[in-house]
Amino acid sequence: MVIPRLPFKEFRDEKIYDHLFKRAEYRPNQELELGQTIIKVVELAKDFNWSAAQIKYSLDRMEKQGYIKLHRLPQKRGLIVTILHYADYIQLGNYMKNKALEPAQIEHQEVDDKMKNAFELYENKVARSVGPMEAQRIGYMVDDYGEEKVMEAIKTAFQLKGKAASLSYVQAILSNPFTQKRKEKQYGYKQSSQYRHRISNDHAGTSGKVSPLFGNKTGRIRRKG
């Protein structure tokens, strides 16, 4: 069986889709049609070591993309997942021969592959699922600056801002990469200046407490005789 290569927005979606595609090959009973499988989000989350919310987010996103169709079973028995165009994908065991990707789709897939590492890095940093708009912004940044620079900017942003770092802050670093370095240098100079100022004040205070060798009295030296 050849699993279709589709343009996914993130690595998690691709892993879940591959899993569902393989499961759809085996039908435990006649209730299911070709290309269908029954899943429970909680069990799938345990299998992949992701949260149930992340699994649900990926399933909803793939449904919007037209890759799968979801049908909720009553009494919390799970979801029926239908792999759309499943029969076409398995025909002759060669998806690439019968369902060749359009040039625009191939280009889109290459872009997704390029932004995958930067996307996953940002998602790990914010510790939540990233929305479509954020994914699009990361894609634009990768197009403009390259994956390596975007990943470096993400790391720098979270080093300086922690969880408060945003994509706007990452964009600012990319737009002017020397800005943060100047801020760091200015901060170091300020700390150094404060230290020198404190030492100067301490020295001045100490000097003021030292009495002159002959006191404050002035006069002529009297000669004997």
Swiss-Prot record:
A family per Pfam: DnaB_2
Source taxon at top rank: Bacteria
Entries under InterPro entries matching the protein: DnaD-like_sf (IPR034829), DnaD_dom (IPR006343)
Protein family membership: Belongs to the DnaB/DnaD family.
Name assigned to this protein: Uncharacterized protein YqaL
Organism, scientific name: Bacillus subtilis (strain 168)
